[in-house]
């Protein structure tokens, strides 16, 4: 009896020791999970895109996807039909429940992902970016800009009928003529460009673009001076905020020129005798962030500023930039020799391209592009799309150009991220002063855009899906995707180093923003 009791005691002690050991192991794993970096994993595909992919799988047996594999394995059996039917019902439910079939359900997808990761802030930021914010208090802040007369006057006093080459010669920077390859180089350094042009990067890029893209015929004799005074006036409306300034505008314009050329869009437009589309895209790039005050649409909507009131909370800053552009065009009218139909087409194209830079429409355009282009590449893209969809290609080119700093050379990219972070923090300071909730990634007391984990979330949800679709359709621009992936690896390394540091210090993950609270 005593021996049995001793055996029970020893056995119980051993079990208790094992339990404590397992508890320590589990506690350690929990601490590691809380401090270990996990990428933000979301489903970026819209319901319509999923449906088209499903139909392609059934219609194209050469593509050995799960649907086709099941059909080949089971034939038209009950099991094969059941699995296909269940998938069809799932897609049908997603389509019926979608507010917009072109937009993925980021609210639910990111909320689920962020609960298991250390990426709540970037999830909140991405959701707010595609949904906007509509609550806040009344404020009078606005940002109205008038062109700097001293910067515009030289172009009004020149010869009546000068050409773009003559303007280049007369107004080239003191350091010498602008030596950049706008058509072939996807990686023009905008900061060197700013220095080389004496602080007038946008004016010089726009002028060179007119020459390099062979667009002078659209700016008729007697109107070149008006065009250049228009660009000079637009450049003067860009403020000295850290990111959305004239250097950014020049950067986007230069990259767009290379994209239009390298993709073949320019060549096809010229073949259709449609240089107007290319010219409109150029002007859209020049004006797309004109007058940007360094605060985003959500800020103006939340604070109920005059700008938000003027444009009914719809694409506030994009509409403001367009309003500035067409107001200034009245004073510097390089379209005076155009027909009414030419001007209206130009105006429609510029408006569509600039409005597309509003991130709240990002997934609409991306999903439509995927649906229209499909698996087509290069010249075959033009066979895959209808004439009325050519504008979509210009819109996508502009979106790639606008997000292009993520695919810039690493040194340039990191510099842009630093500038963007400071602009975000300045907005956060304003929000705090106005007793508004500080927007995600805009609190200077927390990790901002220059945090590796936050950059990874942005790359994985916004940047890489866009570039993968674009570069698949236009492989001649695949250098952008390669560079973006290299930049992502930089941020992944940064995120892991930060995770290791936090783990060594015994820090847990911090959720500063609840995604569920972002319902509009």
Residue ranges and their predicted role:
Residues 241-260, 290:
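Active-site-adjacent "gating/activation" loops or surface patches in catalytic cores
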Residues 214-241, 261:
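Internal amphipathic alpha-helical repeat/solenoid segments
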Residues 196, 200-204, 217, 221, ...:
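N-terminal charged/capping segments associated with class I S-adenosyl-L-methionine
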Residues 1-8:
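Single-pass type I membrane protein transmembrane segment
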Residues 10-36, 42:
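Transmembrane-helix exit/juxtamembrane "anchor" motif
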Residues 185-194, 229-250, 306-311:
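Active-site flanking loop/helix segments enriched in acidic
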Residues 226, 230, 251, 255, ...:
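Amphipathic, well-ordered alpha-helical segments in soluble domains
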Residues 38-46, 50-66, 72-84, 93-108, ...:
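Divalent metal-dependent phosphate-bond-processing catalytic cores, especially two-metal-ion Mg2+/Mn2+ enzymes
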